[in-house]
Amino acid sequence: MEAEKRLFLKALKEKFEEDPKEKFTKFYTYGGWQQSARKQEFVSENEKIVAEKRGGIPMYNPDIGVPLGQRKLMPYKISNTDTYVEGDDLHFMNNAAIQQLWDDIRRTVIVGMDTAHMVLEKRLGVEVTPETINEYMHTINHSLPGGAAVVQEHMVEVHPSLAWDCYAKIFTGDDELADELDDRFVIDINKLFPEEQAEASKAAIGKKTYQVSRVPSLVGRVCDGGTISRWSAMQIGMSFITAYKLCAGEAAIADFSYAAKHADVIQMGNALLGRRARGPNELGGVRFGILSDVVQTTRVSDDPVEQSLEVVATGAALYDQIWLGSYMSGGVGFTQYATASYTDDILDDFSYYGYEYVEKKYGRCGTKATMDVVEDIASEVTLYALEQYDEYPALLEDHFGGSQRAAVAAAAAGISVCMATGNSNAGVNGWYLSQILHKEYHSRLGFYGYDLQDQCGASNSLAIRNDEASPLELRGPNYPNYAMNVGHQGEYAGIAQSAHSARGDAFATNALIKVAFADPSLVFDFSKPRKEIARGALREFEAAGERDPILPAKI
């Protein structure tokens, strides 16, 4: 790639205000932590908090510990945008968009409606029509936001301003039925997807009908992901009783409960082992293929690299920053690990280089998945990436950790292999090979054990035992060899997506989840995750689940 076309140069020049090729620089001349407007704000707010709310107990003090700002406290350009932000604003605690990104996934549950409709018609002799479905949808949208009274009288209810983000919608592969339902309640596959994707999704769904419940964000925060399906199920049962004028005590109601809680429920995340201390619909159980289908870039962009990189960014924010950044590192967070893959157009540059190489030599999805192909593409892309780190010291400082560089180079290698083969297993082997090549080049990658899972990855990828060899789409943060190390999981998700992007698939794993997250009523826009994260960093993103309506008024 010609030097002037390198995508990361603009960001490097803006960040460091130096020639990116300059090999000599300065230290301790930038003003320490005071060069950061955000840290100045932290200090100012801290003084008020200590005096007014903490009774003098000290809190934030940037002069404690290692001196901050020895070098440039660099801003970050959110990749594929023109937005520059401070690093602090990408910590998930400081970014409302990243919080809502997770809220919108955790608070979602999909429930099949056909079992309940069958019980109504065959067991109770009640006719189910588009009109009765509309009546039911009116009822569930009343009851779901806060257990609003529909069966019992004299019930306490939730303030609508606390649960404005809560609603239920319906979708089906049956165009005739969809046309007869109230538009306000329908996720319209034909309108939301390009024609070929719409037809593929409807074919996968068939004539079945599904409800998507969006439980209030506040419920997921106060309770947990395991609560979501139960909250949804209770209101589904009450709404069926009301809409179809049933007796709450009759035996058939148990069938509704079983269907809504178990038989017809699709969670976003599987339950984890007891020692992980998490239930269903928690991040550790969200598989890579599911996350690929949650992200919606395939509906709005024809660029397979962009589609893949949006999944990488989403996975980095969720798996690295929230899941591992809290579960493993307890608040210190892995923000810089994650941001390496979605800032400064660096992974974009490496990935587009690989894509151009693939298009010229093989064609998109133009060759079989063989180890010769994996070795060729992964080696080419990895060496290109390492050459950039050698040529541009500013790039090396931007990715100041070895495992940051390893993750970004390997992600580009894996994505590029998928672009040629349309095979996610080949892609993840491109990742593994990149890690090994990188280690040969630099002798080590990052912290001790960073590449442990990559050293055994190639042999496991074709193993028979399912705890080693699940398809990449069905692996996740709790997959045995993947459960320990940051700087991997978001990239794995992007590699899984890239195989399907190369093939032009309508979805990666589950058409139901792809359709459910095409819903324009969601608070977070899943078609442009990086843009949304940038809005969060700029404090332009309005999140749900806030408690202002029940807090004292501020004058």
Swiss-Prot record:
GO cellular component, one term: cytoplasm
Binding site for coenzyme B: R230, K261, H262, R275
Localisation: Cytoplasm
Cofactor dependency: coenzyme F430
Keywords: Cytoplasm, Metal-binding, Methanogenesis, Methylation, Nickel, Transferase
A Pfam family the protein falls into: MCR_alpha
Cofactor binding description: Binds 2 coenzyme F430 non-covalently per MCR complex. Coenzyme F430 is a yellow nickel porphinoid. Methyl-coenzyme-M reductase is activated when the enzyme-bound coenzyme F430 is reduced to the Ni(I) oxidation state.
Catalytic activity: coenzyme B + methyl-coenzyme M = methane + coenzyme M-coenzyme B heterodisulfide
List of residues binding coenzyme F430: Q152
GO biological process, one term: methanogenesis
E.C. number: 2.8.4.1
Top-level taxon in the UniProt lineage: Archaea
Binding site for coenzyme M: Y337, Y448
Subunit structure: MCR is a hexamer of two alpha, two beta, and two gamma chains, forming a dimer of heterotrimers.
Record-given protein name: Methyl-coenzyme M reductase subunit alpha
Gene this chain is encoded by: mcrA
